[in-house]
């Protein structure tokens, strides 16, 4: 193990893991809502700057194509980006309240960029990709009807959970981010930017209905439009 990796794990243990565990996920995987950031699931008690430094040190390590190390890089990196997304989203909500159109647009674009980066990062390992999850589910069926049945259940498990526990089993996976989470966030972002630009209030019921429509449509689909890019 190289020295940068040793330093990274030491810092992770002393500065991050030593804290009282509380975070269960990152905000991109939860349904968007104004001034509501799933605090019990996404808040943390450590500095994201410290975690960013851990990620930087891991990236300084000599090229290592082992699966375990690649997973470490992805896991730490997506937490860094997820924490950053939370910060930008909180600023976005403040700009909604302040009616600052230009600042709101800038925050919205930054949020979309982070979601895109998260999707690309996770694509560097098949265990962090939606296409493997869907493919494995469809392999359980021995007819087109059964394949579709198992795919629907696989989609349901990681998203709406039948409507009773929405986002309970959220996953930061390539494909799921771009094809599902990002679609919801784009509606949220664009809706508030448009409303502030026009000087009107957002119809919260209509927004929620649009988000639910995206969720239900995705769960009931049987066509995976996403293809993971090949790692370089």
Task: Give names to the regions the model predicted.
Residues 1-222:
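C-terminal non-catalytic alpha-helical accessory regions
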Residues 226-231:
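Conserved small/polar residues in nucleotide/adenosyl-binding loops
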């Amino acid at each position: 193990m190289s020295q940068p990796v040793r330093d990274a794990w030491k810092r992770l243990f002393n500065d991050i893991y030593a804290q009282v565990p509380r975070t269960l996920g990152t905000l991109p995987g939860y349904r968007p809502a104004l001034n509501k950031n799933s605090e019990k699931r996404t808040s943390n008690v450590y500095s994201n700057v410290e975690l960013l430094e851990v990620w930087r040190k891991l990236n300084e390590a000599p090229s290592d194509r082992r699966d375990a190390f690649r997973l470490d890089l992805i896991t730490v990196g997506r937490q860094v980006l997820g924490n950053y997304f939370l910060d930008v989203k909180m600023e976005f909500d403040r700009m909604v309240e302040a009616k600052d159109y230009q600042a709101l647009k800038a925050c919205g674009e930054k949020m979309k960029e982070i979601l895109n980066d998260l999707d690309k990062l996770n694509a560097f390992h098949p265990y962090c990709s939606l296409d493997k999850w869907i493919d494995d589910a469809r392999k359980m069926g021995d007819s087109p009807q059964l394949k579709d049945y198992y795919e629907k259940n696989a989609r349901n498990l990681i998203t709406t959970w039948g409507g009773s526990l929405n986002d309970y089993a959220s996953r930061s996976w390539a494909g799921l981010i771009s094809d599902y989470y990002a679609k919801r966030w784009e509606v949220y972002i664009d809706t508030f930017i448009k409303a502030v630009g026009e000087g009107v209030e957002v119809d919260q019921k209509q927004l929620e209905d649009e988000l639910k429509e995206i969720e239900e449509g995705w769960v009931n689909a049987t066509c995976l439009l996403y293809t993971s890019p090949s790692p370089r």
